[in-house]
């Protein structure tokens, strides 16, 4: 119910409680334009109502007949009510002291990082740093991450994060397949690798014909494998010397991947020093909560010779137009948005925000602080070992960093029961063994309590911790030959910001360099940069969500699983499908899972030969990259002059491949920003030829409440919760990419059998390390849907379409709108064609993007899906005032271009070619340009009151790739 104007309320008598209550208050804050603004925009478009506009935009044949069936969430909750309801669910979780380990550890998030990174919209609302000039802060933080990982692993170069340790290991496998010996298709996994990692590797290997063998590490050299994966330390705690083994593997023509504990590497010889070619792992224990499995930043580091084969994003150093150091994403030609099915990986969004947290943890503690934490953890583990031995138990491993495997024999069940009574979780290794992994949060009191459990089981008295400590030799459990001697984190950034004052100011200095949603609209097409409301973000830091281990017993995670079940049903309602899995921890992984599900379906019908995937020429690069990873053959379907799928070409190719057609991948609305009229026909053609229909959910923000892929012919879709459902982009992650399926595919949804999570009888293997992927950020989407309710979710979709059409209408006289549907209308985004401008003036789309920075805007999506264009998506969250500000900037830029066209401005010496303009350039003693300083920096009057200054001039991309440098820059270079 919308609140009336206070003056009108005061005149009404009598006032009622109902008249004063509102449950739509959140929706009115989430949706940018108020009723008056919406009507003004509708008037501009020539429509009387929003409903009339929607009727003209969306084909009647696919319109949803019913209101979103959200059940108990059909009516919106207020922010307070939603937080209270989620608190009830959170309180059903039980936060036990976790000693489970297996790749996940409790950790202390420094408060200065919690408040100023994780809870700071300047960091979490930013987009992937494709526009480097306005992304220098997070690029520096990610460069710190790369330096940290390279130093700790002892390898030459690291990427800027991957999704989790298991998928990073799978990516390493495919990397080594590309560079390894061609006569082998075997990848060997040591039997002490994390079980969830092995399962993800098997899932990834099967469709591309890699044979995975697992056994003792000692047998790896004889396996004739192109690659070998070793865990360091092993899952049961052993710290083994693999130097001779690595030499033997190399002598046999193979390569070595090491999954290494990031904290252990501060005290153990790094894998790069004993023969590893690739190192992978998780940085979660560097200040990032366990979060029931994620999100966390995985890492990959490689030898220099493999840098161009490395997946994921890579930050490199270049120079700007003034010759000063500038950071940028390097070697982008490896990535799916350029290489498509030939890309090194389908990964887009990774885990930038979590990588930034982990890097700042290292910056804050420095090398000395990290080593102190590691030595303390190792000391506590040694005290546990000494204590249980004193009580008569034997440890299986004599060498260890933080993990012990203990022979407990017939007393195993009793020990688990006693531990449970004290709210302690131990790892269930077997019926006769338990595992204990300690971490930086383990206290002296925890240690005494833990030893008390074993003492009670043994019928004895717990040893005194101080007495144990006094009698224990130094680093007795770390093999002498594997104790680290090489220096690490020597760069000044890791040795300067150790007081909270210094750290606070460093974080502020970085965030001030960047342009995020807290400053202005980010109109990136196909990215849906909408509001990430504060109330949605608050639960992410609740310990009832953050301190839960992903493999905690089910009875301790009741609230989590209820919330997840509810969110799955919300997404079922939104998509029109029958079931949803939240395991995929990025859109790329949801896409990949969907294709594996399609393959499993065909296989179950005796048609495993179906392997052709039809993909329109306009598709996002992840589509062909994912199809290739799923073992499918990509066949491109042409698009017509209007940007729609060419039906005749589709029919011909469906007929040609009728015997081996697996699927078609379409995006709806299309990547051209249009609701194609014949989408039902497309689905029917593919079904008639034995294929399944994959509908990419990247543009779901134009469909919620109005139409649904599961109702117009889709069989499977992935969603991007970090687009449509308000999880922030985090500067390049985290994301969540649920996979939604029709009833006939539900039994093939992902499982994780290695950890006892069996969701579906014939489910595909795990696609993420944890059963529920990035579980700790799922409350964001739950909150958004609960606070919006069915009616307001639909209103948000309608407003997103209204805003896009308003921008298209206002800018059409200045920039041609490349594609539109009937009546010249678009969906939730529009493509502006700048190609004629280049022909008439020499001004490129890149020039316009950089000039927008001078106006205080992030550029729209450049040259996708059509080179030389800008794709604009305003979302529903932007007000008419902000839309008008963007329109004014674009019109002003068009006037600047016209000056070049008409000869009033030089083709080279003009404000577009030299954009962006930094404060240093504008205030320099010399001004060599024909245009004024004022035109450079303050092209519109509104900037005088609120000016964002890009910290660097235009980055030289070619220089950066020719002179690849991906480590921290010396301070002297900035002088």
From Swiss-Prot:
Its GO CC terms? cytosol; glycine cleavage complex
| InterPro entries xref list | GcvP, GDC-P_C, GDC-P_N, GDC_P, PyrdxlP-dep_Trfase, PyrdxlP-dep_Trfase_major, PyrdxlP-dep_Trfase_small
Q: What are the recorded Gene Ontology BP terms?
A: glycine decarboxylation via glycine cleavage system
**Is Oxidoreductase among the key words of this record?**
yes
Secretion signal: which residues? none
Does the keyword field hold tRNA-binding?
no
Write down the top EC class of this protein. oxidoreductase
Q: Could you tell me which HAMAP family the record lists for this protein?
A: GcvP
Assembly and oligomerization: The glycine cleavage system is composed of four proteins: P, T, L and H.
Fetch the NCBIfam families from UniProt: gcvP, PRK04366.1
What name does the UniProt record give this protein?
Glycine dehydrogenase (decarboxylating)
Q: From which organism does this entry originate?
A: Burkholderia thailandensis (strain ATCC 700388 / DSM 13276 / CCUG 48851 / CIP 106301 / E264)
Gene transcribed to yield this protein: gcvP
């Amino acid at each position: 119910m919308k609140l009336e104007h206070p003056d009108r309320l005061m005149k009404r008598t009598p006032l009622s409680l109902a008249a004063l209550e509102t449950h739509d208050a959140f929706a009115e804050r989430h949706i940018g334009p108020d009723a008056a603004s919406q009507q003004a925009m509708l008037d501009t478009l020539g429509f009387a109502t929003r409903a009339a506009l929607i009727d003209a935009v969306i084909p009647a044949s696919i319109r949803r007949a019913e209101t979103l069936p959200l059940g108990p969430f059909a009516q919106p909750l207020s922010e307070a009510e939603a937080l209270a309801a989620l608190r009830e669910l959170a309180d059903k979780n039980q936060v036990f002291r976790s000693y489970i380990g297996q790749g996940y550890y409790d950790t202390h998030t420094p408060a200065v990082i919690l408040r100023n990174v994780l809870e700071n919209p300047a960091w979490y609302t930013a987009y992937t740093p494709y526009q480097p000039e306005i992304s220098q802060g997070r690029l520096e933080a990610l460069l710190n991450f790369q330096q940290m990982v390279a130093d700790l692993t002892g390898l030459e170069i690291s990427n800027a994060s991957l999704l989790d340790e298991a998928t990073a290991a799978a990516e390493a496998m495919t990397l080594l397949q590309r560079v390894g010996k061609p006569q082998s298709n075997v990848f060997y996994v040591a039997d002490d690798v994390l079980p969830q990692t092995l399962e993800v590797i098997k899932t990834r290997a099967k469709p591309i014909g890699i044979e995975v063998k697992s056994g003792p590490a000692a047998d790896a050299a004889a396996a004739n494998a192109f690659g070998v994966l070793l865990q360091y330390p092993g899952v049961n705690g052993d710290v083994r010397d693999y130097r001779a083994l690595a030499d033997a593997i190399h002598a046999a023509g193979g390569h070595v991947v090491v999954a290494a504990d990031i904290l252990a590497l501060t005290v153990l010889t790094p894998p790069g020093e004993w023969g590893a070619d690739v190192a992978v792992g998780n940085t979660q224990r560097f200040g990032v909560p366990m979060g029931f499995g994620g999100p966390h930043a995985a890492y990959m580091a490689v030898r220099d010779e493999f840098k161009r084969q490395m997946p994921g994003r890579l930050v490199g150093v270049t120079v700007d137009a003034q010759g000063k150091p500038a950071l940028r994403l390097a070697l982008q030609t490896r990535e799916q948005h350029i290489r498509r099915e030939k890309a090194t990986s389908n990964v887009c969004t990774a885990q930038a925000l979590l990588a930034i947290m982990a890097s700042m943890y290292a910056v804050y503690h420095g090398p000395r602080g990290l080593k102190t934490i590691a030595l303390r953890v190792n000391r506590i583990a040694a005290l546990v070992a000494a204590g249980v031995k004193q009580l008569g138990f034997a440890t299986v491993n004599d060498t260890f960093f933080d993990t012990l495997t203990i022979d407990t024999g017939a007393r195993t069940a009793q020990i688990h029961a006693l531990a449970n009574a004290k709210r302690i979780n131990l790892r269930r290794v077997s019926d006769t063994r338990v595992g204990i992994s300690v971490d930086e949060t383990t206290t002296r009191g925890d240690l005494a309590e833990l030893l008390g459990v074993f003492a009670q089981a043994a019928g004895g008295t717990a040893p005194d911790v101080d007495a144990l400590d006094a009698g224990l030799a130094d680093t007795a459990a770390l093999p002498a030959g594997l104790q680290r001697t090489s220096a690490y984190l020597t760069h000044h950034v890791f040795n300067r910001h150790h007081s909270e004052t210094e750290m606070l100011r460093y974080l502020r200095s970085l965030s001030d360099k960047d342009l995020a949603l807290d400053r202005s609209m980010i109109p990136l097409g196909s990215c849906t940069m909408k509001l990430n409301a504060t109330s949605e973000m608050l639960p992410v830091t609740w310990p009832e969500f953050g301190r839960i281990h992903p493999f905690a017993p089910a009875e301790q995670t009741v609230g989590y699983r209820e919330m997840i079940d509810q969110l799955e049903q919300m997404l079922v309602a939104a998509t029109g499908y029958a079931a949803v899995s939240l395991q995929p921890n990025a859109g790329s992984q949801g896409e990949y899972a969907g294709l594996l599900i399609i393959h499993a379906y065909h296989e179950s019908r005796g048609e495993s030969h179906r392997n052709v995937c039809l993909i329109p020429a306009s598709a996002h690069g992840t589509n062909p990259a994912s199809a290739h990873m799923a073992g499918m053959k990509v066949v491109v379907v042409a698009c017509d002059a209007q940007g729609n799928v060419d039906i005749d070409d589709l029919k011909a190719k469906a007929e040609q491949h009728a015997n081996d057609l697996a699927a078609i991948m379409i995006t709806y609305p299309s990547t051209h920003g249009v609701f194609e009229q014949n989408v039902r026909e497309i689905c029917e053609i593919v079904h008639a030829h034995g294929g399944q229909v994959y509908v990419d959910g990247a543009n779901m923000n134009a469909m919620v409440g109005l139409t649904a892929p599961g109702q117009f012919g889709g069989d499977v879709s992935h969603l991007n919760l970090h687009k449509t459902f308000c999880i922030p982009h985090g500067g390049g992650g985290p994301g969540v990419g649920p996979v939604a399926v029709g009833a006939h595919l539900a039994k093939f949804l992902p499982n994780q059998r290695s950890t006892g999570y069996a969701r579906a009888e014939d489910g595909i293997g795990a696609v993420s390390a944890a059963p529920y992927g990035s579980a700790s950020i799922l409350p964001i989407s739950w909150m958004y849907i609960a606070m919006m309710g069915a009616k307001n979710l639909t209103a948000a979709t309608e407003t997103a379409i209204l805003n896009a059409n308003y921008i298209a209408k206002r800018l059409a006289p200045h920039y041609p709108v490349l594609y539109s549907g009937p009546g010249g209308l678009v969906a939730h985004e529009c493509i502006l064609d700048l190609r004629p401008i280049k022909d008439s003036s020499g001004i490129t789309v890149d020039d316009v993007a950089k000039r927008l920075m001078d106006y205080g805007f992030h550029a729209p999506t450049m040259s996708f899906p059509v080179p030389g264009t800008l794709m604009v998506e305003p979302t529903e969250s932007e007000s008419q005032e902000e839309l008008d500000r963007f329109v004014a900037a674009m019109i002003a830029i068009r006037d600047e271009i016209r000056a070049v066209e008409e000869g009033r401005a030089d083709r080279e010496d003009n404000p577009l070619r030299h954009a962006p303009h930094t404060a240093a350039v504008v205030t320099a003693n010399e001004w060599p340009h024909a245009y004024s300083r004022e035109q450079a920096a303050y092209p519109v009057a509104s900037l005088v009151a609120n000016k964002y200054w890009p910290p660097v001039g235009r980055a030289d991309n070619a220089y950066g790739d020719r002179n690849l440098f991906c480590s921290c820059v010396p301070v002297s270079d900035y002088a």
